[in-house]
Amino acid sequence: MYKRQEYANTVKHFLISLCGNFDLAEDLTQETFYQAYKSAHRYNGNCKISVWLCQIAKHLYFDYLKKEKHKTTVGIEHLESFEAVNNQGNLEDTYLIKEETKELLSALRQVKHPYGQVFWLRAYEEMSFKEIGEIFDKSENWARVNYFRAKTKIRKVIEDENNENNM
């Protein structure tokens, strides 16, 4: 049971980073597991189950985009779902962590696909570059290069926002 929940969280967080919509990510997560159940006989074990599930989720999201042809964004009210805050910290630390999380999520939404998703998978889901490459049907080197490009782009977005706020 624990592994299933871990896989569900990985898929949901990946989809949130991909589509920016909490409700859509939940719907697509459910659809991902339904499709995985239907096609379990095709899982060949060449990659981790989490990678296979994220591949299914990615394809479902792109299918959704083809049908809907619209963009969405994450609402600030859903930030708590990322569980980025350590509940044992003091109130000031908790506030600072929440603010940093909001800032990072805002930056992730502003960088182009696939940079935000690659960054999320590496930094938060702790996937290897090989696994990230498999999700996007690309090489390990592609994932590595895009991760470092993502870090640069995210850093620039955050610096630009901080410079705007300090004016």
What is each of the regions a protein language model found here?
Residues F33-K48, E68:
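Sigma70-family region 2
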Residues K12-E31, N44, I135, E140, ...:
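Short, charged helix-capping/linker segments at alpha-helix termini
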Residues K71-K98, S128:
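Internal acidic/polar
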Residues V11, L15, A40, L53, ...:
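Hydrophobic-face residues of short alpha-helical interaction/recognition segments
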